[in-house]
């Protein structure tokens, strides 16, 4: 056979998918004529299909050198360069190909794909629209258009693009996967479930699809299902660090902290300097009760993006826990009100090291913290700093004092009611068991909707007699009280609080506080008042696993959700406990 006859036969094999047979003929041709451009080009395609990208690059590179005006080798070279991760070179190859043949929708679409991969969504969108101008019903180009739109923070348009692609190619796993991603971007988690499920059904070897599907299920509190999906992702990619991390978080939510710790330690072998992994490990260790290691890992919080607002530059050294010998130490309260109330218990211990303590705190806590032993001076957060010698963040003190479960400082009360605090007359005139209520946490917390039970969940409490209820609820949720006649008997005293000193005065006069996980719960515990905490599942790491008490607050009793979102069971248990208390001691 002549070279041309061999080429025709090889091309027929190639088009029928018989790549081995085609490859043999291409080799024969190149043995006879090493510069046969068509054979170089097509053999390059065969070698890419075989996974030998280096040989493919060599063949296609020679073809483009021999025929610089030939479209096909440049288009195919772009594909191999993209597969090799040489994305900028791939862009150059595709753009050269399009200069030679501007009517190639496939090449324009491939250029869109690589531009999106490079993080150039504007160029990616332009290239996909060029492809679609040539073939309007081109599913892959529509998908790439959606990817560009999603990267440009235009998720609604991306959803429409993916849906359009799916009308043309309903079994395209990538379109279903990306539609799920767009819904995830919109925080439309319920809508994301179906496309993710369809995606992993069509392509069950896509680890990223299983991973994103699992993340979606976590947001919907379907933690058990999410665990299975994370495990599927890891069965495909055992060293998928993000999947290891998120599976650990899911297991932590389920209270399986031992397994979660093992996963995080495995992930840290691959990424030993990952702030995310160390931060999650710290929370998991603390929830597990391993305080000695957990508080050491907790210092990684300063490398987390979520702590950026708390990071500060100081011109004095950090305190290492050694004797202070009369030096002035600046302690910065950090994170939420409840965190400050809980961990300010360490300040008398700092003062006992021989130092003069200056406490920087949020203004709402300033008066209350004036009752804390060991504080020489208080300043509001944001005010000019006085002179100081060393400093430390408040929540580094458990590590500095080597706190473990047996050495948690639990002498209460460690806070008191300031003498100038104002008490509402409604509290003074109450005759029944005085019970304070809080049904929602801080609206600035991402998980607040899970931690908060809502006023309606407390309906059954209203039928219990000989109880005077008082609302300690602040923020937007406080208005729920005025909008529901069922709760007309609840006195709203929180509106009169100017700061936590006034809150403390009211808490001190209660017989019992019933609260979700929020600052009032911590305040009641710090004041030594009986307090019942209603906890969501998952819950805060400091409440540990399954415990109904806490080493931090001896007067605290915990009521836990048996399943995520199940506030009915929690409130039913609280009602039974309250009736039992009334039966034993009607006066509280």
Predicted features along the sequence, with ranges:
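Alpha-helical solenoid repeat scaffolds of the TPR/TPR-like class and their adjacent stem/linker regions
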Residues: 1-512, 517-588
